[in-house]
């Protein structure tokens, strides 16, 4: 959540950031501006009434001590108190309206984030590893998965519905091996391995920014204040919800393997075949909680950590800087890692590493103490990696002419 003080003191800065994102809010910015103007006016009136109440109360006290008639002051205090209570209630209601608006306003766009309206305006930073030259036409992963008996798409539909899969046989062993490789790699890079619940309450989803704006994107347990997590970013970040951390403990680096659940609202017709877009998928996540001065360096560190796994698996990939119009709600700056898929003849996202600055920290009340003063931390998150998409990339990049799949050396010890 952005700072309420910033909204009140520099409304134009917030409006400019929303414009960069091509983002709109309910009732429009002008309506919000009107609410803020009215709030400021009433706040001044409230402070004036409070000052008057204090002044008259002192005068009343003096007269009472002197045993002088103070009935006129008493009446004045009673009338002023009625006005004070009414105005205080009105100011409180306006604060709630402003806070509700704040909860659905996305993060401020970082100065490093380029302007743009969609993914078409994202900027390639660099490529890592050269895509292989095939002597045959490479197949897509769903053909290879079925040929090798790695993935049973029909059973996924039978057990649940579309966008669910069953991984079995040697494919299940490869899938498990990928998870072990990712966790081991992350641990070597200083990230603590943590296993968390796959269900969280509403407060936790508010903390990381999924609620209230994106309620339709998450699965809610009927008759419970519980939701299936869309990413371990939610649980790892919120381990420190409403916590004051000693500055000596920063940075805090965590990694978790969890199932993730997404409704994929608005994705009808996209990636209907295969494992690219699923309602349930496994992901190994990185989350870091840092001192504000260290978050930029941490973002680079997390990118290189995720990239290191792809290098070990001999998978060509690239770094892409997201433009302002393609940023996620909580992100101030995001760099995607896209992996090469020869079957699709294109790069596809396999990780997003985002710096949310103090946006999530303010929502989740995550602070650190330095020089006897509490300040907001910075939080970062990124996939390291999406397991299903990594297996997709492995199948497509390491396929052989006969349809078999070569296993990279980095995975051998896990199989």
Curated annotation (Swiss-Prot):
Species whose genome carries this gene: Helicobacter acinonychis (strain Sheeba)
Question: Can you tell which superkingdom this protein's organism belongs to?
Answer: Bacteria
GO annotations under biological process?
Answer: selenocysteine biosynthetic process; seryl-tRNA aminoacylation
Question: What does the organism's lineage look like at the top?
Answer: Bacteria, Pseudomonadati, Campylobacterota, Epsilonproteobacteria, Campylobacterales
| Signal peptide positions (record) | none
Record's keyword terms, sorted: Aminoacyl-tRNA synthetase, ATP-binding, Cytoplasm, Ligase, Nucleotide-binding, Protein biosynthesis
Q: Would you tell me the Gene Ontology cellular component terms?
A: cytoplasm
Name this protein carries in UniProt = Serine--tRNA ligase
Q: Which NCBIfam families match?
A: serS
InterPro entries tied to this protein: aa-tRNA-synt_IIb (IPR002314), aa-tRNA-synth_II (IPR006195), aa-tRNA-synth_II/BPL/LPL (IPR045864), Ser-tRNA-ligase_type_1 (IPR002317), Ser-tRNA-synth_1_N (IPR015866), SerRS_1_N_sf (IPR042103), SerRS_core (IPR033729), tRNA-bd_arm (IPR010978)
Q: Which reaction does it catalyse?
A: tRNA(Ser) + L-serine + ATP = L-seryl-tRNA(Ser) + AMP + diphosphate + H(+); tRNA(Sec) + L-serine + ATP = L-seryl-tRNA(Sec) + AMP + diphosphate + H(+)
């Amino acid at each position: 959540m952005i700072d309420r003080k910033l909204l009140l003191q520099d409304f134009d800065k917030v409006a400019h950031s929303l414009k960069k994102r091509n983002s709109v809010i309910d009732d429009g910015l002008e309506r919000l501006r009107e609410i803020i103007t009215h709030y400021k006016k009433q706040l001044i009136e409230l402070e004036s009434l409070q000052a008057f109440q204090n002044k008259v109360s002192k005068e009343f006290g003096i007269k009472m001590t002197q045993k002088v008639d103070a009935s006129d002051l008493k009446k004045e205090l009673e009338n002023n108190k009625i006005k004070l209570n009414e105005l205080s209630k009105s100011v409180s209601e306006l604060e709630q309206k402003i806070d509700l608006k704040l909860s659905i306003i996305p993060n401020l766009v970082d100065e490093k984030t380029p302007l743009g309206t969609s993914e078409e305006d994202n900027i390639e930073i660099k490529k890592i590893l050269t895509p292989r030259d095939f002597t045959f036409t490479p197949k897509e992963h769903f053909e290879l998965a079925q040929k090798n008996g790695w993935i049973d798409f029909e059973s996924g539909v039978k057990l649940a519905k579309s966008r669910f899969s069953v991984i079995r046989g040697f494919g299940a062993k490869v899938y498990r091996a990928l998870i072990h490789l990712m966790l081991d790699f992350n641990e070597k890079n200083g990230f603590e391995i943590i296993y968390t619940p796959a269900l969280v309450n509403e407060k936790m989803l508010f903390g990381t920014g999924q609620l209230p704006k994106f309620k339709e994107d998450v699965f809610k347990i009927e008759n419970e204040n519980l939701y299936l997590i869309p990413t371990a970013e939610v649980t790892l970040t919120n381990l420190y919800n409403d916590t004051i951390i000693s500055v000596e403990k920063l940075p805090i680096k965590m990694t978790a393997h969890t199932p993730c659940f997404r409704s994929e609202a608005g994705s009808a017709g996209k990636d209907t075949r295969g494992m690219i877009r699923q309602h349930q998928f496994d992901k190994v996540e990185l989350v870091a909680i840092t001192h504000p001065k260290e978050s930029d360096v941490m973002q680079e560190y997390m990118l290189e950590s995720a990239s290191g796994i792809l290098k070990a698996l001999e998978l060509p990939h690239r770094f892409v800087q997201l433009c302002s119009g393609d940023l996620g709600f909580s992100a101030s700056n995001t760099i995607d890692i896209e992996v090469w898929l020869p079957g699709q003849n294109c790069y596809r996202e396999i990780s997003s590493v985002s710096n949310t600055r103090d946006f999530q920290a303010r929502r989740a009340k995550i602070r650190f103490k330095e020089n006897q003063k509490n300040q907001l931390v910075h939080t970062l998150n990124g996939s390291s990696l999406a397991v299903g998409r990594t297996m997709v990339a492995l199948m497509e990049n390491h396929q052989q002419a006969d349809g078999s799949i070569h296993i990279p050396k980095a995975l051998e010890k896990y199989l």
